[in-house]
Amino acid sequence: MDCGPPATLQPHLTGPPGTAHHPVAVCQQESLSFAELPALKPPSPVCLDLFPVAPEELRAPGSRWSLGTPAPLQGLLWPLSPGGSDTEITSGGMRPSRAGSWPHCPGAQPPALEGPWSPRHTQPQRRASHGSEKKSAWRKMRVYQREEVPGCPEAHAVFLEPGQVVQEQALSTEEPRVELSGSTRVSLEGPERRRFSASELMTRLHSSLRLGRNSAARALISGSGTGAAREGKASGMEARSVEMSGDRVSRPAPGDSREGDWSEPRLDTQEEPPLGSRSTNERRQSRFLLNSVLYQEYSDVASARELRRQQREEEGPGDEAEGAEEGPGPPRANLSPSSSFRAQRSARGSTFSLWQDIPDVRGSGVLATLSLRDCKLQEAKFELITSEASYIHSLSVAVGHFLGSAELSECLGAQDKQWLFSKLPEVKSTSERFLQDLEQRLEADVLRFSVCDVVLDHCPAFRRVYLPYVTNQAYQERTYQRLLLENPRFPGILARLEESPVCQRLPLTSFLILPFQRITRLKMLVENILKRTAQGSEDEDMATKAFNALKELVQECNASVQSMKRTEELIHLSKKIHFEGKIFPLISQARWLVRHGELVELAPLPAAPPAKLKLSSKAVYLHLFNDCLLLSRRKELGKFAVFVHAKMAELQVRDLSLKLQGIPGHVFLLQLLHGQHMKHQFLLRARTESEKQRWISALCPSSPQEDKEVISEGEDCPQVQCVRTYKALHPDELTLEKTDILSVRTWTSDGWLEGVRLADGEKGWVPQAYVEEISSLSARLRNLRENKRVTSATSKLGEAPV
């Protein structure tokens, strides 16, 4: 059934360009109606915004603009008072006009439509909803018909004159204003009513509302004349092959939509030229950025879902057992961590959070042919793109809301500001370019896109910005604490900024640590892609290269941070430790502090009878480095006097778990050897069980090969996963992020454990309160199998000939 209007009401099919008659969608609050607006007779020169018509052409004899108000402009022009363009007529009389009073302009507020514009000009009025002036903020947008997509040259070139030169200023904040002489009235013979299905109506209205004020910007900037308009339309449709429009209708390109109160929630306001002709320096509107959640919110949701996956049994038909992923079938809804907040994003009118939700993907029928493993692979790739948009969203808040605050800049000095925010703007720019390339790759082939080669290409840029930012993290933390204590204005200004809804009342520190969290998360996302890539394929090689590059970058960042801390510790200790006798060169680039602390030395009293052993106790302080051990006594002013030192190879430790002759406490025996002979022997007592075990583990560390055997697939060892982020407070502790999996080596009765992280083989101590045990045997075996899969791929790449 043809729902289109009669040919007599479609003059654009036979008449000259620009006279096309289009239905207009009018939205007031939550009431929707589609109808033709009655013609409005302008009593005076009219403001014509956004239409590139020269004043000379308007006054030229015979011009189609001089004959009257064309159909596309009926109901869209706000008449001005006879006084000029500086006043506008409202229901209450004349008042000064506002700049950019067109709905497509920033902060547009069209005049109220409840009453006549002037007592002298009683024109036909549109209905008012609810009768309230506050609820009369109307939005108007073009709704393109299906038949206009292939044939209408004005689908993008809205009201574009043939041969007209369009200037680049079409995207500026204030559009050119042209006065139209004459008051010839052209009215509709019979307003046409259209019926739309509920889904089609909501799809069209939702997509139009999300586009914002510059709905015609693409056509106005693409070129000059009708030919340029046609070219702009064709290239725009090609570039948006994955546009999320379920009914496949043409629509304008995204404009400068404002969301939030900051000025940089997007990549750029520049127009998107054809993909083939776009230069490397040009950027375009991100498809995901404007509607993405903050990265902090994404990270919490994604981590929670990964924790559930790592605990889950592999018994159900939809679980991740290898045999269950091969058969074809529709994918489950929770293939991606992003799916946990699908409802939130849909309520906000956002873009798609799952690859399978893209209309082009659903309409292609590919979901019925892909295996569950392949579907999860595509979702893992898609999550990398959407999470990058969330990351840039949070960086935009940090740069625009905090760094861009005039009050905060006035409070801070130039040096403090540099130390506090470091290279955050450079990190944001690098991520914007990365997201742009990712989106272009997605648009090129939405069904079979790849991202690992894009990640690999951007790794050098990541290193240039992430390495110095993460390295300066220690100075950043110190500057923040010093400003809180020494700058009286800083806490108050910061508290007001953190209470703003722009940052969702999140603290500044949660934004400053984002770069290190992101580079770690990015490695994890690429690792998830590698786990699901077919073995022996070219995609596996590319994913492995990207994973290795990110892994090396993370290790380099960690090493850089540790190197600074270790050097500072050695410099600090060298001022406090004094040797008795031989001078020991303490400061060395190859030396770092492993553990230090005070223990109790127990020694038998010489006068005590043999039948009744009595022990004397005195404090001894231990400084354990990676290559030597120093035993010293505390002196005044916090200094230490070393009386014994030994190399690591000369140490032996025995755990005296049973009480010796009724000796209370947690005791162990330390022996210092010289060749094959014992040189010194100390009976030491710790305060807690965990302290004793940590000293024994540090004094006699296991080899890296032994640590690898702990996480081998053939041996089922206890596993725990991190449920709360933990930052190491001592050198022998392990910093953990959510979802990290540890293979446990030692448990203590007072709430500590020693484990080896599966992802990188790092060993350390963590409080048990920050982890939970993985009780499922099948889940533990799956975690070991996935770790072996990644290890095998990386080792195979290392063995390949160059």
From Swiss-Prot:
> What SMART domains does this protein map onto?
PH (SM00233), RhoGEF (SM00325), SH3 (SM00326)
PROSITE patterns with a match to the protein in the record: DH_2, PH_DOMAIN, SH3
Region (Disordered), start-end ranges: 1-21, 84-138, 171-190, 222-283, 306-342
What are the GO cellular component annotations? cytosol
Q: For this entry, list what GO says about its biological process.
A: regulation of actin cytoskeleton organization; regulation of small GTPase mediated signal transduction; Wnt signaling pathway, planar cell polarity pathway; wound healing
Q: Pfam families attached here?
A: RhoGEF, SH3_2
Please report the name of this protein according to its UniProt entry.
Answer: Rho guanine nucleotide exchange factor 19
